[in-house]
Each structure stands twice: as C-alpha cells, then as structure tokens.
Swiss-Prot record:
Keyword hit for Cell membrane: yes
The organism's place on the tree of life at top rank: Eukaryota
Recorded name of the encoding gene: OR2M4
Protein name as it appears in the record: Olfactory receptor 2M4
Keyword DNA repair attributed: no
Family: Belongs to the G-protein coupled receptor 1 family.
Any one GO MF annotation of this record: olfactory receptor activity
Glycosylation, residue list: N5
Localization in the cell: Cell membrane
Residue ranges, Cytoplasmic side: 50-57, 121-139, 220-236, 293-311
GO biological process: detection of chemical stimulus involved in sensory perception of smell; sensory perception of smell
Disulfide bonds: C97-C189
Length: 311
C-alpha cells in the first residue's frame, strides 16, 4: 500500500514561524523564554499538588492533570521548532509528523474533556457542598480523569490513522511550526472531503459538547453565587470560578476559531498565530491564572519553600 512506504520515506519540511532577521531572532528568544517558564510552572504545579496534603482534593487533582497535559502539549510542539531554528534542519519524516499529530490531537481532546470535568467539580462544590465528598469521591474523580485521557487518545488515533492513509504528491513543505492536521491536508493528493467531515464531527464532540457542559454547570453556579448570604463565600466562589472561566475562554476561543472555520477561510500565517496562542501562551498562562488568584496554592508554595529553607 502507498501509505506503508510513505510512512518511512516521505520527508516533510516544517517552514516554521521565524526567520533569522533581528526582529524574528528577538521573538524566537521570547518564545524560548516562554517555553522555559511554562515548563517550570507546570512541573512545579504538578509537584506542589502531589507533595502538599492540603491540596489533595478533587479540584487540585484535576488541576494537576491540566498542568500535566499542558506540559506534554508544549513538549510535543516546541522542542522540534527550537531545534529546527537553531540547527537549520527543518525536515521531519511522516512517522515523526504522525507522532506529533497523535500527541497534539490527543492532548487537545483530553484537555477539552478535562475542562468540562473541572466545571462539573465547581458546580458540585458550590451548588451541593454538603454532598461534595459523595458526588466527587476519589473513584469518580479518577474515572472522569481517565475517561478524559482515553477519549482524547481515541480522537488522536482516528486522526492519525486518516493522516497516514493519505498519499502526498504535491510540495512537502508544511507552512507551520509543527505538524498540524490543517496544514498537512493541502499537501495530500488523496480526496480528503470525507476526512474533513469526520474532523468536523470530532470538533463537535471535543469542543461543542464540553462547552455545553461548562455553560450548563456555570449557569447553575452563577445562580447559586448570587444567592449566597456571606460576602466572603461569594468572593471565594467567584475567584475560583473566574480563574477556571478565564482558562476556558482562552483555550476554547482559540481552538474553535482554529478548527470550526471552513477550510477556505484558513491562511497559513493566521493559523500559525492562532496555534501559537494555545500551544505556547496558554500552557504558560494557566498555572499563573490558578496560582496567582488562589490563596491555598500560594500558601502551599510558601510552606514548601520554608521547609526547604529557601525563604
């Protein structure tokens, strides 16, 4: 079969997002700094939640999974881009491209479902506080997390199988800084309309369904917050929920703009900018949004630093 040979023989060229002009060199240095900061933030968040017993709650367990997904996402896309820019070697095999696509799509899907689970967690905590330990028991929490990872991986497998089944007979230059499906489709000489319809279905499942759960959850949360008698309780609930909604808005807004548009509306430069937003900036911003506005995380961090005599 054609694709079996291409898996090992096809070599693509990732054109990247930067050239070597002074302005682009500065921007590359900025991205490198953001990458380093995102690595440090997300690793710290995962370790902090694992180490500190006061953070061993469903909300923080889910937050640790979000940080782990962000960590894996940024490590899927950026190291190759950084290596290509520094070495000048922009080639990538179809197998390497497929690996990027699988992890990228899987992590995007898993994060979509996880954000919906996090919204449900806030709904239970605020609307049914007395039943929280029952409705969000450890077994259910782990089950929903595993389901998020599994559904994301299934989506990655479906997309990967389709991408490897295509034959590529036009220019093998990918106008992107990583192997994104939208950038790879124009290079195929195989009819892709059926796959594009499948991609729309996957986007509906991964984006529209979780967003519906989030909107429904927060409509109940907003109603409950408005009727809270204590100003302090209202402020704490609003702070926690606004952090989550900020992450949801950043992530889903960029993802929907990227994948829910008609193919005719896509342009390489625009796609690269939007992809950079949720594969580079969002993994860096998420830990900041949660940690800077969360006193429990801040206190836990201070406690860990004091234990190690760093402050």
């Amino acid at each position: 079969m054609v694709w079996e040979n291409q898996t090992f023989n096809s070599i693509f060229i990732l054109l990247g997002i930067f050239n070597h002009s002074p302005t682009h060199t500065f921007l590359f240095s900025l991205v490198l700094g953001i990458f380093s900061l995102a690595l440090m933030e997300n690793i710290s968040m995962v370790l902090l939640i694992y180490i500190e017993k006061q953070l061993h709650t469903p909300m923080y367990f889910l937050l640790s999974q979000l940080s782990l997904m962000d960590l894996m996402l940024i490590c899927t896309t950026l190291p190759k881009m950084i290596f290509s820019y520094l070495s000048g070697k922009k080639s990538i095999s179809l197998a390497g491209c497929g690996t990027q696509i699988f992890f990228y799509v899987s992590l995007l899907g898993a994060e979509c479902f996880l954000l919906a689970v996090m919204a449900y967690d806030r709904y239970v905590a605020i609307c049914h506080p007395l039943q929280y330990t029952i409705l969000m028991n450890p077994k259910l929490c782990v089950f929903m997390t595993v389901a998020s990872w599994t559904l994301g991986s299934l989506d990655g497998i479906i997309v990967l199988a389709a991408v490897l089944s295509f034959s590529y007979c036009s220019s093998l230059e990918i106008h992107h800084f990583f192997c994104d499906v939208a950038a790879l489709l124009p290079l195929s000489c195989t009819e892709t309309s059926a796959f594009e319809r499948l991609l729309v279905i996957c986007c509906v499942v991964m984006l529209i369904f979780p967003v519906s759960v989030i909107i429904l959850s927060y409509s109940h949360v907003l109603r409950a917050v408005i009727h809270m008698g204590s100003g302090e309780s209202r402020r704490k609930a609003f702070t926690t929920c606004s952090s989550h909604l900020s992450v949801v808005g950043l992530y889903y807004g960029a993802a929907m703009f990227m994948y829910m548009r008609p193919a005719s509306k896509h342009t390489p430069d625009q796609d690269k900018m939007v992809s950079a937003f949720y594969t580079i900036l969002t993994p860096m911003l998420n830990p900041l949004i949660y940690s800077l506005r969360n006193k429990e995380v801040f206190r836990a961090l201070q406690k860990v630093l004091k234990k190690r005599k760093l402050i």
